[in-house]
């Protein structure tokens, strides 16, 4: 039996109406029960993805790519006056809420219009991502307006948000996994492990709804060409702290580059960025080297570094130039030389290795990679419990132009997508922060034509955003121009020269210190923040958390983090 989109939206409204995580879980369980009652296990996949503002699975690295301007044009095409919709958006601060309030003004094509099903909405939105070429914008507007016309105000509320991929109901992957754990009577930590490997909440949901054996189902195992989120490190206050905690850690050079995940099956190679983008065609020289590795199939992880003629790292932006280049690869390849320092192996000859300790994974890696690979090198490492030797290795890593050291527990397994306490990073300066732009204000003087000041935010456990300051320095005029063009495409509303934007642009911020402050809800503020880099290789999921801020604050005050 088909599930109506309105049935889902009614429960989404309940979820949005509470701030309590347990209540959100209980309401989500109502959706699971609806799926079971209607015998529609495939629909739980769609519900889960929609709940977190996605039409596609994370590993697919696809977006609808519809900005507020196209959505507003689609709304206008249904019969709502442009000034009316703009004023209502300004009053509510949300296109979805504004559309719900004005939904009665939409011209209905028929009094007997059939309400859209969940499947119909999902299929219509997936089509949007395939529309390209001439007249594509008009075609997208026509598709969006066709589904809006069939929808009730509550459906329009969530349709608008889903089109912008920002549902604002406070659902996160951990909350969904909590609901699964309770309803299907499965340990949450087991579900977290499976999700980390498949990187697809919809697939896991569908398998649970089908009552599959989730522990032995082949589709729920680590697979070649289905990238996973990388394991992330925490910050530590000193080398000695790490030795006290781990005994004899494995120290590795922290390279000044971009993380890559390399998949190989027979003679086919795919390389993914940290955001899980397929960058294979942009770095052909690395692809050719990977083909020469003697392995039937594998997944390895490393840091891609741009090198100058003296063997020292070039600026980070040069790597992004290579990753973004789609055409004339040969010319930029000769200009920007790349090398990948491989530090982990996750899969080898049809076997997942992520449950093996690091010391065993490293041993396998060292047998596979040899010095004959010019563009692929194993990361420099030192395993020791001697602080002086570790300090010398750290100083050497800095002397060759890199950022510091990674400190890893040799007995630790690989935990995809988690910021773990078995891997730390140690650098000579305070850790920079990855934040997302939430508002932008026009500049002054010669920069008055561009957005020049940005409100920036970090996240909490549930991925809610919290402002931590404003930043305006550190950007070139070219970067300001490019940012302004990007912001125009993701602007939700503009009030007094300040644009409220979709949280999609990630900045790396340096600062003098983190201060306690009651100015912002998170309780902290940045002193003298400055943009270090525009991180096009990162998404909102990669930004720092309030927990990270607290840890850095403790370290700068000499309290440590252990």
Swiss-Prot record:
Its EC number is 6.5.1.1. Its cofactor is Mg(2+). The active site is at residue 254. The gene is lig. Keywords: ATP-binding, Cell cycle, Cell division, DNA damage, DNA recombination, DNA repair, DNA replication, Ligase, Magnesium, Metal-binding, Nucleotide-binding. InterPro entries: ATP-dep_DNA_ligase, DNA_ligae_ATP-dep_bac/arc, DNA_ligase_ATP-dep, DNA_ligase_ATP-dep_C, DNA_ligase_ATP-dep_cent, DNA_ligase_ATP-dep_CS, DNA_ligase_ATP-dep_N, DNA_ligase_N_sf. This is DNA ligase. It is an enzyme of class 6 (ligase). GO terms for biological process: cell division; DNA biosynthetic process; DNA recombination; DNA repair; lagging strand elongation. Signal peptide: none annotated. ATP binds at residues 252, 259, 274, 303, 343, 419, 425. It comes from the Archaea. Belongs to the ATP-dependent DNA ligase family. DNA ligase that seals nicks in double-stranded DNA during DNA replication, DNA recombination and DNA repair.
